[in-house]
Amino acid sequence: MADGERSPLLSDLGDGALGSGNGGVSPGAASLGAPNKPQSFPPFPSSTQPPVLLSENPPPYSPLTSPESGSAPVISCRVCQSLISVEGKIHQHVVKCGVCNEATPIKNAPAGKKYVRCPCNCLLICKVTSQRIACPRPYCKRIINLGPVHPGPASPDPQPAGARVSCGHCSNTFLWTEFTDRTLARCPHCRKVSSIGQRYPRRRSLWCYLLCLLFSISAAGLIAGTWSQAQVYGGIYASWAAALLLVVLTLARALYWSCMRVSQPLHNLT
């Protein structure tokens, strides 16, 4: 956030504010002087002038003369293009325009800093490594994205971690990374599900066979114990059906896990 660089470069700035920023957002960028109200705010720059001027350099001194200062050196305001006298202000980094009350730099930014102008025309100063700064004006508060400081060639994509697997259905090879005790993989080629290794489906089929055996014994005991009562109470047949349904379901799941195709890992990439 704000790094405390709030010392004004121009003591008598009004609305020409200088803010400080670091590598993140600087919501507390300092403003030099009380800002004007939004209704007296100058219009935004035209389409020929970019709204955000990154690393803005000071304009050169103009050989023209200002009517108020005689032969004093003047520069053009970066906002309204009016002439600003810099006589007696050479030691300052920025000067204030008397027409639009915005700041214009007359010196290069201090070492390690750069100038940035907000779309609201507020002149900000931030670190050269800053990627985002916030305008300090209460009626603006824009977040200005400056982008990477040292753009370069994109780093190569990291090598994927995992193993190449041969599908048990179509024998095509695909990459799989989620190796757990419950590993089922869907082949991206045939879209069928298979198991990575035989341990998981074998264990599941064993549990289903045991449950099927337990439900079969229970169903047989229920039928044998209620055979005579079922002749009188027809609702007992529903309990028989439920018990037999559990037997069929567990048997079907046991057969499903027993017949599941197994995909074999080929070699690791990590």
UniProtKB/Swiss-Prot annotation:
Membrane as UniProt keyword: yes
Reaction(s) this enzyme catalyzes, per UniProt: a 1,2-diacyl-sn-glycero-3-phospho-(1D-myo-inositol-4,5-bisphosphate) + H2O = a 1,2-diacyl-sn-glycero-3-phospho-(1D-myo-inositol-5-phosphate) + phosphate
Stretches with biased composition (Gly residues): 16-26
InterPro entries: PtdIns-P2-Ptase
Span list, region Disordered: 1-71
EC supergroup of this enzyme: hydrolase
Name by which UniProt lists this protein: Type I phosphatidylinositol 4,5-bisphosphate 4-phosphatase-A
Source species of the chain: Danio rerio (Zebrafish)
